[in-house]
Amino acid sequence: AMTVPGTKALVGYSGIYDLEKAAITMKTKDAQRIAYFCDRDPKVLREASPINLIPKKNVPASMLVCGTCDVTVECEQSEMFASALKKKGGVCDLLTYKYYDHNVSSKTSDKMEEIFFKSVDFLTTYMK
């Protein structure tokens, strides 16, 4: 979304935004996962990381959702991305759910409906 001209808004759920710093990328010993992340090639990871793709102007409004107990993709990924977006002048709503894991927005979560409606409201506001 960051590289598509005219993008007005982005909503991210439990996302990896800096592949070079994500625990799922750097700490895994799983060969399949390592291969999925291009054998951890720093150049590829840097070029594919949304945190490095934020435009210099017209930063899309963003809403990021994460759970503080996410062991799949640490919540710090969303926190770092939110900070970087704001530094570039973007609007970013960071919704952090204490004690929730990677499935904070899944259909099994008691927060699913709340997050869905917050997403709709956010997109309705910024897609005008």
Regions flagged by a language model, labelled:
Residues 50-59, 76:
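Conserved serine/cysteine hydrolase catalytic core
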Residues 1-5:
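Short glycine-enriched nucleophile-adjacent loop
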Residues 23, 75-76:
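Conserved catalytic-core motifs of eukaryotic protein kinase domains, centered on the activation segment
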Residues 16-19, 69-71, 99-103:
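Solvent-exposed loop/turn segments at secondary-structure junctions
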Residues 57-58, 63-66, 70:
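Short beta-strand/loop motif that positions the catalytic acidic residue
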Residues 11-14, 65, 97-98:
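Alpha/beta-hydrolase-fold catalytic nucleophile elbow
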